[in-house]
Every structure is written in C-alpha cells, then in structure tokens.
Amino acid sequence: MAPPAVTCWLLDTRSLWTGDNIREAAADLFPLLSSDELASVTRKHFIKDARMSLGSALLKRAYIARSLGVAWDTIRFERRPDPVHGKPSYVPAEDKSASTISFNVSHQAGLVALIGTTADKTDLGIDIVCVNERNDYRVIDADGFEAWVDIYTDCFSDAEMWDMKYSLDDGVTLLDGTHLSAWELGRHDRCTRRNLELSATQKGQNGQPDRSVTFSSDLLVDAKLRRFYVFWALKEAYVKLTGEALLAPWLRDLEFRNVRAPRPGTVARCSTHGTWGERVSDVEVWFKGSRVEDVRMEIQAFEEDYMVAVAVRGDVREEVQVEKVDLARDVLPYTNKS
C-alpha cells in the first residue's frame, strides 16, 4: 500500500482582515480560538503580524479537523517534547486514542505555510522565506556580501559559508533575459560588491559568434542573496523537523550540498493571482561528513520573492505538493464540524 500523502497548505493573509486593528477586523473569528491562541493574536503590535498569527491558528485547526474528523472546539494543543520550546502538538480528547498526526507551521511576510501528515513515525519541518522583506542591502552596501554572510557564521559550516559567498553554479540571468552560465561568468562568481560594472563573454549558439556583455554586479549579489535564503530555509525546515531551535549545538555539522535557488514565479497583478515557480528536490543533506539518506528536502518558489522549504523523514516517497488554500472555501467550513 502506498504511504500516506503529506499535506502542504499555503494561506495568503495579505488581503485578509483589512484595516489596522485585528480586534475590529476579525472579531467574528475570535470565538473560534482558544484563550492562548487569542492572546497570541491580539498581543501583536502590527496587524500584518496579527493576521499571520490568526491564519496560523485557523490553518492548524482546519487541518486537524479535516484529517481526524474531530470537532473544532475539541481541538487542544501542547508543545512537545519541551513545553516551552517544543513543536505545537495536537492533544486528543480523553475518549480518543492517541493520534499520530504531525504538523508544522511557518509564516513570513503575510503568507502562512503548514505541512502535515497522519503517517506514523514521520517527522516534518517547514519554513517560508521572503527574499526582499528585510533591509539586507544596508549591510551589504556598506560592508559587502561576504560580511553580511559572516553574520550567520554560527548557523552554517565553513563549506556552506564559502559556497554562499563565492559560488553561482546556475550562473545569472541579465535584465534582457540573457543567461550567463557559471563557466561564462568565470571568476566574476567571486564578486561580493554591488554597484560595479562587469563584462563577460557569452558563447555563441547555433553558429553565432561569441559576444561581449556588460552588466551590473547587483545581479550577482541579488542571485547570491536569493541562494542564501535557500540555505536558510532548508536549514530552518530541517531543524524544525527535529523539534529543536536554531540554537541547536550541531547546526554547523549539518550541511546542504548541491543547492540551487528555484526559478521564481510571478507576482500577483491586477486580477491575476501569484504563480508558483520551480520546485527543487535534489538537494543533498550531510551531517558530520556523512550523507543523510532518510530525510527528503524540497524547496518551492512562489511569486518572485517567496520560497517554501519542506523536510520530511519517514516512509513518504512522493514529492510534496504545496497547495494554496482559500480561507472561506478550505478553512472556515471545518469550524462547524460536530
């Protein structure tokens, strides 16, 4: 029998609960939450953070109600194995047998992602990143990309640090759509500064002559920054799979190899929805110099700046399909389940 599928949902809260006060915008949903969940939502200073907190709470409950057929108001949570830092886990009602349901949630820049399964002996982790949300270029422009990566030296191995700073195995795409391979870039892959004018020779195709192209080093740094966030999301997803935090003492022993950034999708414009980009599933996981064979890692691009990384350990063979869900259609119907 085929192993149970893994569910992966993505909820976009950017256009939900408009205004600047979550208590007013989402008051009708507050009775659906526990006191702890409600406190987590309402203590957020910015409504964008409150939206994600509310979306996360609703998504977890909907997934459990759908997967186990339990009533919404009977769902309870606790953190395991550590009551403070552990992962939120479903606690079955007293008259229910222990459940094997497992899930993990991540949110960033308005999007909330959930991964879950009812398969026994399966561990999950998920992380979502947004490349252009933070003010990364302030440090990069002042000190260079090398110095910016060095901020995270406690999280990555020496090999990963070097790889992020000086490798662009996929090359770079210029503003006119021209793609330069890593071979054509040559030692420009070592460039870590913005605002430089670079030149390279593009190999002619189909009998066409070679041609010289000039481009800004901003494109190289942009590509490296996007790839850094791939490393970050993969590491975060793996750490969450283990139930530990990014303070885990073995972080630098965990290495990802064969890492490349998935090609982006397109951002939502006017009446169109944002689209999915490429999914990459051939990353290698290494720990203390040995290949980790029992954990599957994938990363999926969404719109131009988002990427969702998932980690799965267990008897799950198929690729994880990330599904965008709608609040009214896919989540709220489970609130009335009894």
Where are these regions (language model features)?
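Core catalytic alpha/beta fold that binds nucleotide/phospho-ligands
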Residues: 1-338
